[in-house]
Amino acid sequence: MAKINDNYLKLKAGYLFPEIGRRVRAFAAANPEAKVIRLGIGDVTQPLTPTILKAFHEAVDDLASENSFMGYGPEQGYDFLIDAIVEKSYKPLGVDLKTTEMFISDGSKCDCANILDIFALDNTVAIGDPVYPVYNDTNVMIGRTGDADDKGYYKGLVYMPCTEENGFFPAYPKEKVDMIYLCFPNNPTGAVATKEQLKGWVDYALANDSIILFDAAYEAFITDPSIPHSIYQVEGAKKCAIEFRSFSKTAGFTGVRCGLVVVPEELEGTTSNGEKYSFNKLWLRRQTTKFNGASYPVQKAAAAVYTEQGWKETQANIDYYMENARIIREGLASAGLTVYGGVNAPYIWLKTPAGLTSWDFFDKLLNDCHVVGTPGSGFGPSGEGYFRLSAFGNRDNVVEAVERIKKNLKK
C-alpha cells in the first residue's frame, strides 16, 4: 500500500477556519432569522472594474478566433504584463528590475508555498508570531519540522513574537537563521515597516547570509509616502530578498488568480559543495517544470490595472476598503477597545476586552452582535487575546457591524 506524507498529520492550524465555519453554521441553524455579517475572511466584495473587465472580455474574444488564438503561454509570464509591472509599479519607487527577474503566477499564496522547492530542507527558517498560516504550514508539510508543542510551536522553526510591546515588528533571532519570512503591511496585525526597519533586516540578512522572503501582497494599501512598498527600495535587498505580490486584494482578483514573484539575478545560495548558485535560475527551472503559466485572459486583465483608467478605478476600490478600515478602527476605538492596524493596511487587529480569550470574543460577537471575525490565537500563540477584522466587506454591512458591536459593548 502506498505510504502517505506523514508530515501532514502534524498540522494543527487547519483547525481555525473549519472551526469558525462550524460555529457559524450552528448559530445560523439555531437562529435562522439572524443576519450574520462576516468581517473575518479576507475576501473582497467589490467587482472587477470596467477597464479590467473590458480587457478580460477582449482576451476571451481573442481565443475565439483562429487568427488571435493563444495556446500555451510563456511560463514566466507574458511580456506585456511583466513590462507593465516593471515600468508602472516598480520604477516609480526607484526600483529598476530586469524583466527576467519577474515571474507571473496564479497567486502569491501558491508562490509562498512553492518557493520552498528551491531551498534545501536543512535550512533554518524564522517566521513571525502571529503569522499568515501558509508560512508555517508549508514548512511543516515538506518535513522541515517536528511536532507542535502544547503552545502550537513546531520544533525546527524559529518563531519571532510580534507583540504590542515591540509594535508588532519582530526582533532579530538570537540564533542564526537561513530564511526569514516578513510580511508588510502585515497580515494579520495590520502593522507596517519603515524603510529604516526594513534596512535593519536587510543588513541582518546580508551579515548572516540569510534570505528574506518578503510578502508585499498588501503594498497597494499604503498611503503614507514614507512607508516603502517594496523591500527593493532598501539598498542591498536584491542580494538577499525574494518579493511576492498579489492582484487579489489590489485589483479584486481573489477569484481570478494572479500574482508575481521577483527573484533578482544577483541573489545566490550555496550548493551542498559550497559553491554559489543563482536562485533566479533555480526558480525558472522550477516554474518551467511545474507550472504552465497564468492564463492569457487573466494576464490581459492584470495588465489593464496599469493603464491610466485602470489604475484610477483600482485605486477607487482600494480607497473604498480603506474607508471601511477607518470606520471599523475609529468605531471600535470609540467603544473603548484598543485597536491597531487599519492605517496603510486593510486589517484591524484589536485587543479583546479584559478577561476574554480570542475564542471567547469570537463567541460574544457571534452570539450577541451576529458578527464574525477571526480569533487572533488562530494565527499563532502570540495572537491570543487579539482579534482580526477585515475591511473588505460591503460598506453597509461594515457600518451595521460596527454599530452592533458598539451598542453591545456599551451594555
Curated annotation (Swiss-Prot):
Top-level taxonomy: Bacteria, Pseudomonadati, Thermodesulfobacteriota, Desulfuromonadia, Geobacterales
Entry function: Involved in the synthesis of meso-diaminopimelate (m-DAP or DL-DAP), required for both lysine and peptidoglycan biosynthesis. Catalyzes the direct conversion of tetrahydrodipicolinate to LL-diaminopimelate.
Pfam families: Aminotran_1_2 (PF00155)
Residue numbers carrying N6-(pyridoxal phosphate)lysine: 249
EC number: 2.6.1.83
Residues noted as binding pyridoxal 5'-phosphate in the record, renumbered to the chain: 72, 108-109, 132, 187, 218, 246-248, 257, 292
The protein's required cofactors: pyridoxal 5'-phosphate
The keyword Thylakoid belongs to this UniProt entry's keyword annotation: no
InterPro entries membership: Aminotransferase_I/II_large (IPR004839), DapL/ALD1 (IPR019942), PyrdxlP-dep_Trfase (IPR015424), PyrdxlP-dep_Trfase_major (IPR015421), PyrdxlP-dep_Trfase_small (IPR015422)
UniProt catalytic activity: (2S,6S)-2,6-diaminopimelate + 2-oxoglutarate = (S)-2,3,4,5-tetrahydrodipicolinate + L-glutamate + H2O + H(+)
Family indicated by similarity: Belongs to the class-I pyridoxal-phosphate-dependent aminotransferase family. LL-diaminopimelate aminotransferase subfamily.
Source species of the chain: Geobacter sp. (strain M21)
Identification of the protein by name: LL-diaminopimelate aminotransferase
